[in-house]
């Protein structure tokens, strides 16, 4: 099984962000945790602060991967381009957010991109990624 894990803007700076909201692991530690918890799955990790690069990865994901996990960061509230790319992507897709968005600012309540995924997980820090992988394994059987 091959899973693409995409991370959007500012997730490369997790070590500088509020640990109460985002957890205490930086992106490389999250990637290591994922590989340790699911050693039989082939993961490709990609992070970009650029919307177009994320769109390019999504557009080709269903050619090379069995599933997609995406944390679009702030783009989840604003990006029609990512929304549209997700709509065209024909593999299971789960959106993950480290922080508990329902407890955050009003502008974070509208998840444009999540509407084109199979579901989203919010508020469990790095464990949200593990939960998404668990669900993908169940979906793909």
What are these model-predicted stretches?
Residues 44-52:
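Short beta->alpha junction loops
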Residues 79-89:
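Short Gly/Thr/Asp-enriched flexible loops that form oxyanion-binding sites at enzyme active sites
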Residues 45, 94, 103-141:
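Short, glycine-/small-residue-rich phosphate/pyrophosphate-handling segment
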Residues 88-102:
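Short, acidic/small-residue loops that bind anionic groups at enzyme active sites
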Residues 9-11, 73-76, 99-101:
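Short glycine-rich anion-binding loops that position phosphate/pyrophosphate groups of nucleotides
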Residues 1-4:
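Extreme N-terminal starter segment of soluble prokaryotic enzymes
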């Amino acid at each position: 099984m091959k899973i693409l894990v995409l991370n959007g803007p500012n997730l490369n700076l997790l070590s500088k962000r509020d640990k109460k909201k985002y957890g205490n692991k930086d992106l490389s530690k999250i990637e290591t945790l994922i590989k340790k918890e699911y050693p039989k799955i082939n993961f490709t990790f990609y992070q970009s602060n650029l919307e177009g690069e994320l769109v390019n990865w999504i557009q080709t994901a269903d050619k090379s991967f069995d599933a997609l996990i995406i944390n679009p960061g702030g783009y989840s509230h604003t990006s029609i381009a990512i929304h549209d790319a997700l709509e065209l992507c024909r593999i299971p897709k789960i959106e993950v957010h480290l922080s508990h968005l329902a407890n955050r600012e009003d502008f974070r309540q509208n998840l444009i991109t999540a509407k084109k995924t199979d579901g989203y997980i919010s508020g469990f820090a790095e464990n949200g990624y593990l939960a998404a992988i668990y669900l993908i394994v169940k979906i793909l059987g």
